[in-house]
A protein has these predicted regions:
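Conserved beta-sheet core of the metallophosphoesterase superfamily
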Residues: 97-172
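Core catalytic region of metal-dependent phosphoesterases/phosphodiesterases
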Residues: 2-8, 12-108
Length: 172
């Protein structure tokens, strides 16, 4: 049976992110090079996602120079049907050929999930789900190693999910 996975803020090809530190001074991505980081995330993706699965990417797919070339050489090697929730660093013109669809959010209220790039205000979550039977869990990215706000939030930035897509059934 096909599964649905989620991941966010891969920042493929973003060499600068390797120098970022968290609030206690620890590197947010402990890799020796951008190539090692890219390879680790791609290997992790391939290890859990099958060709019939779907992957919701909650934004900030890649960064840096030669984005279109990097996507053409690498992204199609990753299995699964890819859906994008647009992030603040995403170039839609470059990314469009590689995603089945691109949205500002994906509402799976039948499963109690709302996928966004940034955490939404709790009142937005309550309002968007007032006719349903399940409360919405806001599955989001953007904040990297920072904690999600209190309440119905789950960050799926790669730094918080061991650089590996997560099966949404684990979130429900």
């Amino acid at each position: 049976m096909a599964k649905t996975f989620v991941i966010s803020d891969t920042h493929f090809n973003h060499a600068g992110i390797l120098s970022f530190k968290d609030y206690i001074g620890k590197p947010v991505r402990d890799f020796d090079s951008v190539e090692q980081m890219n390879e680790a995330m791609m290997d992790n993706w391939v290890s859990v996602v099958g060709p019939k699965d779907t992957v919701i990417h909650c934004g900030d797919v890649l960064f840096g120079m030669d984005k279109a070339d990097w996507m053409a050489r690498n992204f199609d090697k990753l299995p699964g049907k890819k859906r994008l929730v647009v992030g603040n660093h995403d170039n839609l013109k470059i990314l469009a050929p590689f995603f089945r669809d691109m949205q500002l959010w994906i509402d799976m209220s039948d499963k109690g999930l709302l996928f966004t790039h940034t955490p939404q205000h709790e009142s937005t979550l309550a309002e968007s789900h007032r006719f349903g039977s399940k409360p919405l869990l806001n599955v989001h990215g953007h904040i990297h190693t920072n904690p999600s706000p209190e309440g119905p939030f789950k960050c799926v930035c790669v730094e918080q999910i061991n650089f590996t897509p997560v099966d949404i059934e684990e979130l429900i």
